[in-house]
Amino acid sequence: SMCPLVKSSYGFAISDRCPFFHFADLVIGETTCDGKKKMYELMSEFKPVHVMELPNSQSERGLVFWKSEIIRTKEYLEEFFHIVITEEMIRDAVHLNNEIRMSLKNLCELMKLDPAPVKGEDIQKMVQGSKYRFDFATTPGVVKEVIDKIMTEYRQGKHLEKRPRILVTGCPIGGDSLKVIRAIEDNGGVVVAIENCSGVRTLGNPVEEDCEDIYEAIARKYLSTGCSIMTPNDNRIDLI
């Protein structure tokens, strides 16, 4: 018995029904849960897979190890694609992704308004959809336009009626599992925050762009994520 995330991911991959997997040259995985580790092992039978070994504690020793894994992955990509990834390229990517995360965080924080400006499903679709854009550089501007439009309409009185405000936490939500949000909102509630891997959990704590060691900065940002595989997992409690 495996969780729906593992079953659906592997099912879409092996059945060749996922266009993203179909056109991908390489899959990068990570050692989070046992189910995903076994999934990547089986995926490697029909697609190149590189697995990053993720520490299970947010200690300084874990940070050193995670930094080495990031560098190892960078070197693997260079060898696999026959390219050179410079530090300047890394810093440019860090800056862009910081801007993207900040714009999406600002979007999610609109749900602090009471009554809520829009449904939580709409926000989640926007956050999820941002991951599948071909031109990432335009994402912050597009998200800002959406924020401005929502706020303009809110000031005009266009918003939801007062509803019970719901926090959703737990496993990632996307695709068919959006029905969880839909069920809540079709029955009179409004999902104002989604605290999971596909929600606000990844949007805080930007990578420190001015850090002399950019790889350590990247490692520190991602290792601090309040993921359920971490023990202890105080960062998740703090986020909630």
Q: Language model features by range: what are they?
A:
Residues 75-206:
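A charged, amphipathic alpha-helical module
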Residues 1-87, 193, 197-198, 202-240:
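Trp/Phe/Arg-rich N-terminal binding region typifying the photolyase-homology
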